[in-house]
């Protein structure tokens, strides 16, 4: 399982939100490229970038920062989400050297777009499913739909989606532990690999994901925990690599 540091971008800075609320953000660095360097030097094997402004505006806003990080680390797998609603935007990021593009709101509102994107950019598409109480949220988490996460995930199995990033909104940024039971249920219910996100606080949460014994959970995204020092990227990755269960 991969430990994937998150860099959330708001107005060009690296921030963390609590439960997806733009008004409840903590700025951790005004130099996201240097922050990326910190996690790379700490041994991370993939980075998770989010254009928060883009998620709310429906188009890329912090694209220059994303491009700068991708250029600095051309061999590092990078995934980007936030405001990706067109094939043109996906093409822009892929050409910039981004490995994976995360489709969130657009995947919920227009599932056929995911199939189209997978055909155009095979192996590059991740679906981001953000949920509250099992129901999918959209538009920067401002809207809660009537769509069940597991039902929607199954719809994408035939499209060739690389993975699903599953975020539990109630947990995100709160460092109170991730929703292991639902993450495991989602990974067990779909053929698509799942990356867990939201609420990871320490090594115990990483162990809980591994203890679920679901092969489909291939990664864990961590944000506030690594910024506030309750989780060490290198230590967590080493723990995953040596985990025997």
Swiss-Prot record:
Pathway it works in: Amino-acid biosynthesis; L-histidine biosynthesis; L-histidine from 5-phospho-alpha-D-ribose 1-diphosphate: step 4/9
Gene Ontology MF, one: 1-(5-phosphoribosyl)-5-[(5-phosphoribosylamino)methylideneamino]imidazole-4-carboxamide isomerase activity
Compartment(s) of residence: Cytoplasm
E.C. numbers: 5.3.1.16
Active site: 8, 130
InterPro entries: Aldolase_TIM, His_biosynth, HisA_bact_arch, Isoase_HisA-like, Isoase_HisA-like_bact, RibuloseP-bd_barrel
One Pfam family named in its UniProt record: His_biosynth
EC class name: isomerase
Source domain of life: Bacteria
GO CC annotation: cytoplasm
Keywords: Amino-acid biosynthesis, Cytoplasm, Histidine biosynthesis, Isomerase
GO biological process, one term: L-histidine biosynthetic process
Catalytic activity line of the entry: 1-(5-phospho-beta-D-ribosyl)-5-[(5-phospho-beta-D-ribosylamino)methylideneamino]imidazole-4-carboxamide = 5-[(5-phospho-1-deoxy-D-ribulos-1-ylimino)methylamino]-1-(5-phospho-beta-D-ribosyl)imidazole-4-carboxamide
Gene3D superfamilies: Aldolase class I (3.20.20.70)
Keyword ATP-binding carried by entry: no
Main location per the UniProt record: cytoplasm
NCBIfam families cross-referenced by the UniProt entry: 1-(5-phosphoribosyl)-5-[(5-phosphoribosylamino)methylideneamino]imidazole-4-carboxamide isomerase (TIGR00007)
Entries under HAMAP family matching the protein: HisA
Family label: Belongs to the HisA/HisF family.
Name of the molecule in the record: 1-(5-phosphoribosyl)-5-[(5-phosphoribosylamino)methylideneamino] imidazole-4-carboxamide isomerase
Organism: Pseudomonas fluorescens (strain Pf0-1)
